[in-house]
From Swiss-Prot:
SUPFAM superfamilies: HAD-like. PANTHER family: GLYCERALDEHYDE 3-PHOSPHATE PHOSPHATASE (PTHR46470:SF2), N-ACYLNEURAMINATE-9-PHOSPHATASE (PTHR46470). InterPro entries: HAD-like_hydrolase, HAD-like_sf, HAD-SF_hydro_IA, HAD_sf. The active site is at residues 8, 10. The keyword Cytoplasm does not apply. Coiled coil: none annotated. This is Ribulose-1,5-bisphosphate 5-phosphatase.
């Protein structure tokens, strides 16, 4: 039986796409209120321009996901001058709507409760900045079930870097051979955890048909020790 389970957060314990969509819609609305002449298409181009530059400059760090940076850089490119107040306003609008849209995937809380009752330590290991990841956990109501939270901002490296797995194990006094990693990302979560000896579980609730799955993805999925499409399946694997 596992002594510790490490979970990814984004798109594992809650669905990411609807939250991101809600955040962008709110940021567009706020930009229009501030007097920017954006429609959906032009705002998408504006957002992607900022995102692209930030990822180019900060790739491999928690900052590469920071929406305030995306909006800051996008506004600089769009206006030719710093607009700190507007960048804050767009970032605030994005994250407020994002958090409001969040909801747990089915069986998430029940699974965490059962693991907790079995005496299994639960850690979150996640690629993003600490402030927003803590806000997400609060919003989802998961703080009572989690023994440890580690963000890539704390380590200065992102999954699949080994420190994102070895550090939580060290803090929980657990060995890799006794731990399980659960996540949706084949490279960051599965390959990274495999490299340090954890048992790996790919969480893929999409249930895409064989007709739409590429041979490359099917081959890559074999990197995971297990693949599940509901979190409720996890407790049988761990016990």
């Amino acid at each position: 039986m596992a002594t510790a389970v490490l979970f990814d957060l984004d798109n594992t314990l809650y669905p990411y796409p609807p939250c991101n969509q809600a955040g962008k819609a709110a940021a567009l609305e706020r930009a229009q209120e501030l007097g920017y002449d954006f429609d959906h298409e032009s705002f998408a181009e504006f957002y992607q321009a900022g995102r692209r530059e930030v990822k180019r400059d900060t790739g491999g760090t928690a900052a590469s996901h920071e929406r305030y940076l995306y909006f800051k850089r996008a506004l600089e490119l769009h206006t030719g001058s710093p607009r700190p107040g507007d960048a804050l306003a767009l970032g605030d609008a994005y994250w407020s709507a994002y958090l409001e849209e969040m909801s747990l995937v089915p069986d998430a809380k029940e699974t965490l409760e059962e693991l907790q009752e079995q005496g299994v330590d639960i850690a979150i290991t996640t690629n993003l900045t600490t402030t927003i990841q803590l806000a997400k956990l609060e919003r989802l109501g998961l703080t009572d079930y989690v023994d440890l939270v580690l963000t890539s901002e704390e380590t200065g490296q992102e999954k699949p870097a080994s420190v994102m797995f070895t550090l939580p194990l060290a803090r929980l006094d657990s060995r890799a051979s006794e731990a399980v990693m659960v996540g949706d990302d084949l490279e960051a979560d599965i390959a990274g955890a495999n490299a340090v000896g954890l048992e790996t579980v790919l969480f893929d609730p999409s249930e895409e048909s064989d007709a739409t799955e590429s041979a490359d993805r099917a081959a890559t999925e074999r990197q995971a020790d297990h693949s599940i499409d509901t979190l409720g399946e996890l407790t049988d694997l761990v016990s």
